[in-house]
Amino acid sequence: MGDNKNNGDSGKLLYCSFCGKSQHEVRKLIAGPSVYVCDECVELCNDIIREEIKEISPKRDHDKLPTPHELRNHLDEYVIGQDKAKKVLAVAVYNHYKRLRNGTTKEGVELGKSNILLIGPTGSGKTLLAETLARSLNVPFAMADATTLTEAGYVGEDVENIIQKLLQKCDYDVEKAQRGIVYIDEIDKISRKSDNPSITRDVSGEGVQQALLKLIEGTVASVPPQGGRKHPQQEFLQVDTSKILFICGGAFAGLEKVIEQRAHTGTGIGFGAEVKGEQDKATISQILGQVEPEDLVKYGLIPEFIGRLPVVATLTELDESALIQILSQPKNALTKQYGALFEMENVELEFREDALKAIAKKAMSRKTGARGLRSIVEGILLDTMYDLPTVKGVVKAVIDESVVKGESDPILIYENNDTKAASGEQ
């Protein structure tokens, strides 16, 4: 490198003292006392420092474990209702990470792992609760669909792929992945097809439950590293799943009838009883709250699998008032999200109270819970969002009940206080 420096001193080509590239091969060459550094080497140094900070940060976050009250308060900011489920989750998650921090007690007692089972209708907030908890704890979060899983050796997704997803979320940092949270949705769909074991293989039902057993309880899973297929000679990553918190969720349609039959608390003849009216809907939530392991066995989950999910939380079906709150109150409420999108066009978006009620009623009629709200709002605003970037002078867009019902277009207010329906401008 001595020659390169001499060339620079004599007014000839300058070279980076670190990588040896000439001043013509880089965008910028910074001079120091008898030394030169290029912009590429500066960026590389920044990347190295950022990686080191990333490695230190999780340990600091790990030392600050939120209390159950703090976890519950964080959930309240993003999830409406489900108070009982929030409390159960907050305590279970707090105990799980407390176990990771402390290991065994002074008396040498090993603390067992408490994975969680969430039971509740579609759109009641199961996925959002799990995702929000992971975000509040600053740990990796991965989601899997139980219906896509099959036993090893069959066409479909192996259960080990769940750990692969978790590793991808934290750039294949094994230590970080081992403190993560995995949410497995549609867990009720892998229930055994009948009470009696079948002669034929049930590769997407009981077989998947068997495959998930060790993973959920705790095992050392071998996962191919990043780009493992391209570099088969690389060693597999060893991930200890005993430190990963597994949360399983499902709607468990018809489970209330199984519980009713056991407890003899139904209004009819168990499985023959029909569910009618709002009062009976509330009763279903109460019945699900009385679920016992034997009910889940009768539903089709094998006893060993239920034993790996000792913490059970039931979620209630969201009513119209809860859906209205979901639209406007949480930190990431849909009205706030779309309001932010309109704000980027320098336009204020207003949803009137009657519009929120109409959207909630439409979601109730679709029986999709909170999950259906986004598609409804997207449909209402689609034409306006399409035209808005090309329409000049709009300062405000107003959505009322008639817009939701499709009887009129959104009201656009212009700089000169002129008011027109959205379709009136092209």
From Swiss-Prot:
Species assigned in the record: Shewanella denitrificans (strain OS217 / ATCC BAA-1090 / DSM 15013)
GO MF annotation list: ATP binding; ATP hydrolysis activity; ATP-dependent protein folding chaperone; protein dimerization activity; unfolded protein binding; zinc ion binding
Cysteine disulfide partners in this protein: none
Record-linked Pfam families: AAA_2, ClpB_D2-small, zf-C4_ClpX
Entry's Gene Ontology cellular component terms: HslUV protease complex
UniProt xrefs under SUPFAM superfamilies: Glucocorticoid receptor-like (DNA-binding domain), P-loop containing nucleoside triphosphate hydrolases
Protein name: ATP-dependent Clp protease ATP-binding subunit ClpX
UniProtKB keywords: ATP-binding, Chaperone, Metal-binding, Nucleotide-binding, Zinc
Gene label: clpX
Self-association and partners: Component of the ClpX-ClpP complex. Forms a hexameric ring that, in the presence of ATP, binds to fourteen ClpP subunits assembled into a disk-like structure with a central cavity, resembling the structure of eukaryotic proteasomes.
Family the entry assigns: Belongs to the ClpX chaperone family.
Keyword Nucleotide-binding among record annotations: yes
List of residues binding ATP: 121-128
